[in-house]
């Protein structure tokens, strides 16, 4: 498959070869790796990348991804970071209008009788800036022999990806991770990852938030190695009964497997380091069809034989959950940790109750923001915000107007902050979408 610049204009195409969305869990080869937060299977690609700015698609270096292309005259840019805050393009703030209103007439494809199919709307625009990024890397020894993926945690707004001259995929949706399989084209040394980012696409009709408009790779980029058996997706549902001391635990998991083998998957719950419950999951195998990767699914629901400590903002009590994957010899292949809390949220006669008691929310709206770096923030800024929350007796937050970085949600669990998480979906008043 080859990349097509016309995908920018087509509202029906918003992902090509992108992996399905899945849970945001970490995973490790052993408990020792987990305790040390080992990077055995994760490598950050953040840092200085080669970069070329172009005003539109027609003037971009269209062949920059090809092997042997001379990019010696490219600039250097920091990833993650907004392109506009590193000396290129212009900063723009818009609230209730599309960013091109008053400059260009655009209506979404098929939205009104004379809208047409949108051909050339963005791909042939005189102003639709493009950022061409190049990163070179060698494969870590711990990655070799495993499946290798790249994860972009946030890219505004549409991106094309190549590795070693081969087209990998395309994605829109600026504030959710996009993950791609690099395995067929990865090398031990001298890999060339190329990313072409376009400021606007048909996604712009849906991503019309009231904030500063930027573009570029503004969140971290990670290489991930997946072992022969890997937990792809996990859903954990802690259920607190009316007694507030008893409850159930529901677990659903989906695993991928390079080749068929017997495995044992065990759910384990710990309280302050001590195992208080564990149970094996019954797994079902299914062939994916066109792929060589087998899919394995499992589910369980059990009443916990413990006296539960509920979670609330006064006492955000968390239990340590782990999903263990072992082979037929009982050797650990992978573990997936998750911190979970038990709470019961209800609305009775238009009143919110938590664990049977009325809940009073003292909340705020929060943008991811740092004065010099825009929405490109780190965990340091997140912790400062949480400190301000606690100093001002704030117990709830609305992530206006987009999904925040993944660590933020874990921090809110730990700090006892009720979180309303937005999807990145906002249309202006009287929109024709």
Language-model-detected regions and their locations in the chain:
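Short glycine/proline/serine/threonine-rich loop/turn segments at secondary-structure transition edges
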Residues: 145-146, 186-190, 302-318
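Accessory beta-strand-rich segments of carbohydrate-active enzymes
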Residues: 2-22, 31-36, 50-54, 82-86, ...
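Extracellular recognition modules
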Residues: 194-196, 320-324
